[in-house]
Every structure is written in structure tokens, then in C-alpha cells.
Amino acid sequence: MKNEKGWLSLGGKTCYNGGREQERGNAKMPQIIEITDLSRPELDVFCRLTEAQLRNRLEPEKGVFIAESPTVIGLALDAGYEPLALLTERKFIEGKAAGIIARCGEIPLYTGEREVLARLTGYELTRGVLCAMRRPRPKDFREVCAGTRRVAVLENVVDSTNVGAIIRSAAALGIDAVLLTPSCCDPLNRRAVRVSMGTVFQIPWAYIGEQPAEWPSPGLDWLNGLGFKTAAMALREDSVSIGDEGLAAEPKLAIVLGTEGTGLTARTIADCDYTVRIPMQHGVDSLNVAAASAVAFWQLRAK
């Protein structure tokens, strides 16, 4: 929040935005702040805070995440997410970042030359603009599952690239919602948001349970109680092919995908209603979880 003196709280830190804003027509515009000191504490949100610090588990109402590129930031704004501060190369203010800047209103806009921002962030801002945004209130998985027919469940998927790719495939290929066990990577991790291309703001998602001990039991029981049959994606001798007609005919199906490398736990596989395999050729024994998810989502989508 910004008070009358222009101070802004970002992830628990207090930042100064100059106490004034510019106006373009009747619209209030961000106060442009030239970066001359890379150690300014208000820049920590963009470069020095860890993902855990941004998330702020102890005070989730103060949590922040970073969105990159005009496309991704625009999707977040479309979904109602609150912008807190912008960081962009000076030349983009009237270029690729102009539309986003106009939408964000009176928030701090930090800017500098490419070399300055590269030293600050550790990489070039090839996507033009970063936006620090307020994390939303966590949703209950029951709320997310209301009225759905197909949901994806990620078990202990810790790689941010995979989480982002799975969410993107889910949004594109007919999945209604994504659920994550408590040990999964945060979907609002910077890389996960980037890889998802903003689809994390378009498809509902939630954690199923608050503690790792709540999965697979009672987590799977909760899904069954909501009317879902559960399908564990795993290569087992007793598995059914992903093309099984009975599987596709299920009115409500939860597609359960396991962590990188080891896949689903034996207990999860045993407790699911189905064990499902993707037939392979040329001696290939498995697919990356993100690739497997895309195949499963398309084949098992509600018809």
C-alpha cells in the first residue's frame, strides 16, 4: 500500500516512490524513478529477495511475485492481480512497456539503461519489463474443483519449468483446474510464471492440503468425495492404456502426475482408481512429466 508520503510496502519492505505521480490525460501514471544506486532496498524485490522471501509464508497477505513481459503482465492484470512496482529499460517506457505502464496506474516505475539493469538483475531484460505483483488469497481446492470434469494433480513436482509447462498444457488442452500437493514448486515462482506464458492466471489452481502428510491420504479421499475417479500416470504391468474407453468415459477424472525422475509414489499408485500408461515405441521407456502431461490431457479431456 502507498501512504500519503509515497512509501510502498513490497514483500514486507518499505519503498519510496517519490510521493507523487505523473498524469497522462486524466489517467494517473507511475512516478518514473531513475536507478542510480543498485543497492536501493526497494529494488530488492526484483533481484535480491529469494522466492521464499517473496512468497512470505508467515504473512501471506504481504506475499509478492514477479511477472515478466508485457504479455504475461497483461494476463495477470486481466485476472485482477494487483501491480505494486515496475522495472523496465528506459527505451521501453514509450515502446513495448507503454501499454502495461498505462494500465498500472500510480505505482513506482524504476528504470535505467540496459547495462545498469543487467548488473542489477544478473540478466538482460529481453522481455522488456518486470512487474512486482501482490500474491492472491490462496484458494481452497474444493472451491477450485467446483463444477469441473477434468483436473490435473501434481505430486511433488519441484522443477519450476515443469510446473509452468504443465500448467500451460492444462490450460490449452481442456483441463479445468490444477491441484498441487504441498511439496510442489510454487506456481507463482518467477520461472514457472514465465514458462506458463501467463496461463497460470487463466486456469484455476490450488494446493490440495496444507501439509505433505495430507497426501496421498486423505488427499485422494477428498477427491473421491468430490466425485472424481483418480488416474495415476505410471508404467506398471497392471496399468490400462491411455486409450481405454472406460477411462475416457468417466464423468469426473483427476489425472495424477508424479515428480521428475521417480514418478508417483507406490502408495499413490495403489490408492488411485486407475493406473494409466502411455504406450511407447522405439524402446523409449518414459517421457518427461511435462511431455507426458500434454499427452494425457489431450487424450483424457472431457468429450
Describe each region flagged by the PLM.
Residues P30, L109-T111, P136-D238:
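RNA substrate-binding interface of SAM-dependent RNA methyltransferases
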Residues C131, A171-L173, P187-F201, A266-K303:
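Structured adenosyl-cofactor binding patch, chiefly the S-adenosyl-L-methionine
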Residues Y16, K28-E94, C184:
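Boundary-proximal intrinsically disordered activation/regulatory segments immediately upstream
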Residues G95-E106, T268:
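Short, aromatic/basic amphipathic alpha-helical patches
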Residues G105-G122:
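A glycine-rich helix N-cap at a beta->alpha junction
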Residues A231-V284:
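Active-site/ligand-binding-proximal alpha/beta "capping" segment
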